Amino acid sequence: MKKLKLHGFNNLTKSLSFCIYDICYAKTAEERDGYIAYIDELYNANRLTEILSETCSIIGANILNIARQDYEPQGASVTILVSEEPVDPKLIDQTEHPGPLPETVVAHLDKSHICVHTYPESHPEGGLCTFRADIEVSTCGVISPLKALNYLIHQLESDIVTIDYRVRGFTRDVNGMKHFIDHEINSIQNFMSEDMKSLYDMVDVNVYQENIFHTKMLLKEFDLKHYMFHTKPEDLTETERQQITAALWKEMREIYYGRNISAV
């Protein structure tokens, strides 16, 4: 896309929001409580603050304020307000390609924020536990928050990921013409690295005329030991392993498709 000469500040708002899910099987009530305590500590407010602060570094934002909170019995949230970092617009890369993991990227932000909320969850029947992290990166300026996508997914356990990206508002060029988007985008997948794309099955649902983009990701490889908490698959019978595998796959597909699936 040809670079635009704008009248004043770039007023477009670009919002990236996504849910990241980690799935686990805990055989007993004690193991379920242990998993919730483990994941709650692993992603406490301090750790999340470190992740989001590094995200600010990746996209070149200045941190204005940090609000963080750990909740009882579980969960945490962090919100960071960020400000613009003046840069030469000629140095900003507007092309569609994966962001860094974290190499330096320059951004131009104003009235922007980055926030995360966590939701550990379990049920006494079935042994299934889930951890969900809701993340939103919203920026005003010339660069898309999609540049931070690779880093954030790699930092969190990601069996399933749902991503939404939207550009809102408009900005004017020097001739008074309104522009409702200032960069080319066909798919969120174009901002992911090849190694990440090779790990997931993905599907897009995009509304191009509204500048709304949606991608869902489901981990391809399934290794049962990755999903067991304090239990080894080899300590289970073959029937138990098959039942647990079926339950985990059903849980993952239901989250991925966003609907309950009847047992076969």
UniProtKB/Swiss-Prot annotation:
Positions marked as site (Cleavage (non-hydrolytic)): 111-112
Cofactor annotation: pyruvate
Pfam family, one: AdoMet_dc
Catalytic reaction list: S-adenosyl-L-methionine + H(+) = S-adenosyl 3-(methylsulfanyl)propylamine + CO2
Keyword S-adenosyl-L-methionine (UniProt): yes
Enzyme Commission (EC) number: 4.1.1.50
GO biological process: spermidine biosynthetic process
Post-translational modification Pyruvic acid (Ser), affected residues: 112
Record bears the keyword DNA-binding: no
Cofactor binding notes: Binds 1 pyruvoyl group covalently per subunit.
Cysteine disulfide links: none
Gene Ontology molecular function: adenosylmethionine decarboxylase activity
InterPro entries: AdoMetDC_fam_prok (IPR003826), S-AdoMet_deCO2ase_bac (IPR009165), S-AdoMet_deCO2ase_core (IPR016067)
PANTHER family: S-ADENOSYLMETHIONINE DECARBOXYLASE PROENZYME
Subunit and interaction comment: Heterooctamer of four alpha and four beta chains arranged as a tetramer of alpha/beta heterodimers.
Descriptive protein name: S-adenosylmethionine decarboxylase proenzyme
